[in-house]
Regions:
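Positively charged, low-complexity terminal tracts
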Residues: 1-169
Length: 169
């Protein structure tokens, strides 16, 4: 079922995220700059394979992890956008899958153990696995929005600073 997703930038950490409503909850999937570069590279490889007609039609773990299985991200979730108190760190993998003879680029975010332990006893233990599917046009739009130039422009507008990068320690 098609869903709307929003991209956002966290200026304090230079991280970006995707927010989506999925299975009765809102989820923020947050990536650091290294993972943004990893996703950009995977998007580019997918578009190249798509254009060269190298995509494999048979669904398998291989195609679902074709462009990487070692990504790390933060997931925050809750039933109301303004109250996403649950969070955890997890892995994601990048690939593609055919649905009704059409290929979709996929970001599969594994379930995350909830590390917000101070919220009481009525708290979800973990998030659900999130499967995001993108058409070729959506992949191109995401590539444009993930571009360093676009992120620099957004970062400058939010902070007044010309340097989009985080401190390394």
């Amino acid at each position: 079922k098609p869903r709307e997703a929003e991209l956002f930038l966290i200026p304090e950490t230079s991280k970006i995220g995707i927010q989506v409503y999925y299975q009765t909850s809102y989820f923020d999937i947050i990536f650091d700059q290294k993972d943004v570069a990893f996703i950009q590279d995977a998007f580019s490889k997918y578009l190249q394979d798509f254009d060269q007609k190298k995509l494999i039609r048979k669904k398998s773990q291989k195609t679902r992890r074709m462009y990487g299985a070692k990504g790390k991200c933060r997931v925050e979730w809750g039933t109301i956008k303004s109250m996403m108190n649950n969070y955890g760190d997890t892995n994601y993998h990048l690939g593609y899958e055919f649905k009704d003879n059409s290929p979709y680029f996929t970001i599969i975010v594994k379930d995350a153990k909830n590390i917000a332990t101070d919220l009481g006893s009525n708290v979800s233990e973990k998030s659900v696995e999130i499967q995001l599917y993108f058409t070729k046009a959506q992949v191109k739009t995401l590539l444009d929005n993930f571009s360093r130039e676009r992120l620099q422009t957004e970062y400058s507008a939010l902070t007044g600073s010309d340097t989009y990068s985080s401190d390394e320690y």
